[in-house]
Amino acid sequence: MQSAKPLFDYPKYWAECFGPAPFLPMSREEMDLLGWDSCDIIIVTGDAYVDHPSFGMAIIGRLLESQGFRVGIIAQPNWQSKDDFMKLGEPNLFFGVAAGNMDSMINRYTADKKIRSDDAYTPGGMAGKRPDRASLVYSQRCKEAYKHVPIVLGGIEASLRRIAHYDYWQDKVRNSILIDACADILLYGNAERAIVEVAQRLSYGHKIEDITDVRGTAFIRRDTPQGWYEVDSTRIDRPGKVDKIINPYVNTQDTQACAIEQEKGNVEDPNEAKVVQILASPRMTRDKTVIRLPSVEKVRNDAVLYAHANRVLHLETNPGNARALVQKHGEVDVWFNPPPIPMTTDEMDYVFGMPYARVPHPAYGKEKIPAYDMIRFSVNIMRGCFGGCTFCSITEHEGRIIQNRSEESIIREIEEIRDKVPGFTGVISDLGGPTANMYRIACKSPEIESACRKPSCVFPGICPNLNTDHSSLIQLYRSARALPGVKKILIASGLRYDLAVESPEYVKELVTHHVGGYLKIAPEHTEEGPLNQMMKPGIGSYDKFKRMFEKYTKEAGKEQYLIPYFIAAHPGTTDEDMMNLALWLKGNGFRADQVQAFYPSPMATATAMYHSGKNPLRKVTYKSDAVTIVKSEEQRRLHKAFLRYHDPKGWPMLRAALERMGRADLIGPGKDQLIPLHQPATDTYQSARRKNSTPAGSHKVGKDPKTTLIQTQHTGLPPRGSDGSKPWDKREEAKAAAMARNKQAAKERMDAAKGGKGKGGKPARKPVVPR
């Protein structure tokens, strides 16, 4: 794989003399205090500004600041007018626009298209502080505010909408967001390299329209430039006329002339020697090859072509062998350069080692930002995921190659949290990333890695070229928990259990020291049909890991539980599959409360299946096998009801479905039967977590969850209490103990008031006031 210029090798911009700001400014008053007369770059984001490396605007802002640029932040502006977009003045170089850490549509709507009642990235968790399709709206307002200032579009929303994409909320294929947003250039994936290169070039006076050779960018152009070889992939191959094989020794440019000479009937002398001229065919080099995808008009009207385009796109995601792509949108082309080169360990350390304040901007006062509260004591140790799950967009956004931080950098960040972050109690809530256990796991051969086009390194089985050694991660865990002032290191990121079982030593280390009562894992299903479409391992891998987990838990003398979570209504899932999953859940004693239905997010492979009914994991043709799709609201409710087989509200629907499927034998009181024959006299079931089902502003909380239930959020964790706490949090234990002491003291005071007698007629002891 080709190398890239290191992030720390660029010359600094002249404004470096101002030094790093305590916080990137959000107002003119803050700019004045810093001595700035203007911003070089202004970042507009749909999230509240938290100066922490888990928030995209903080990473990009601090990175640009480290290059010497003066960077301002406009967080969650009022998009109804251009006024908020002008409050920091006109930027000298460009506006950087992002919707935030989440796609704005997924952030606002549930998988059933219901409006969410909260927003974790907003102070107070308040919903409604960002528009739908925020990247598009913000870009248009920036252009309205300052017409001639370039707009650089980035973030996960823009990244996953860079190509013509199926939009679940409108149920149609939309243009590339670059067309609708009026932006000048789009940066996709983790954009550190691209944003620094673009900023540096603009600072040298280059025009934004001339920046067309930066990896990880998309832009609009009129036609294919000279010197490029275009591969036409606008149609699906089909049987047709086979052309006559041309004589390879004939100069094709002179074929017509040869035909004329032959018509003259001249007879050549067989004894006369002739010089044969062999013409070199034009060589197709990867660096100058572009693949033309079907146009937006074609994929909008032909779902099979859409699936074909999705397949080609995903085959061109390896930075080592990816070629440029181009897609026609009306009269213009949207051009996609190959993905960015992954960052080295030194560069990852550089990015995560910048002077983050690690707290929200002071402008928010004491208002809590739920997303920050969730991650303020967590540490990101790597990026990327080679799992390739078709319903997930992490691989499309962060890449398949794992980008690791050094152990020294991670330890420094833990020490910084210990010494700097308010409220630290000695517990690191997570040491992970997109997955918990892919740290320093990679292909054994860089050459093979650069040439590979497989969508997953672990499906249908673990690739023999994948190094599954967990020793670096084990050493990191041991070093982290040995730090003074650190009481506990928890692992809250999702565990890839099919990888973990390859290293029993790792499972033992994890279970013995790093599980806080619950460990979340994601089998997603039990049946082969949906698992194959998800590219997830069979349930046998889960069973193997469960045995190891229980063995090492028992050896450690602990009481710990696995929290498996599942997806309903995923492409490839039949009613019978969901029935079998429900039987498995009941047989294993699981009662899932909060259920996640499949959410068709932009650009995901499973979304292409959902829209087209075809499987882009294989060659797509009009006659290729169809994929079972669950689209109707009624069937989606049925699949969720199977997962919540214990909820009486779903029993009438399940009875009708089981009778229709010829499985009425599963209706009855037996332990091997799924649901009772009759409804209860009163509905006693109540969800332990009713988020998104209560009106905005309501703070009702259900009854305490029973220990036999699995109450899972979309993260797979048990539900939070009314105050946002976690069940295993030590603070909750202390609070419960204090309440018990209060009750005991109150009882003793009452006894004293009644006659000064305690138990057995003895004088009551003086009440103890709890501290």
UniProtKB/Swiss-Prot annotation:
Transmembrane segments: none
Ranges for region Disordered: 683-771
Keyword check for ATP-binding: no
Bias (Basic residues): 756-765
Keyword field: 4Fe-4S, Iron, Iron-sulfur, Metal-binding, S-adenosyl-L-methionine
Radical SAM core domain segment(s): 371-649
Recorded superkingdom: Bacteria
Family per similarity comment: Belongs to the UPF0313 family.
Protein name listed in UniProt: UPF0313 protein PSPTO_4928
Species name: Pseudomonas syringae pv. tomato (strain ATCC BAA-871 / DC3000)
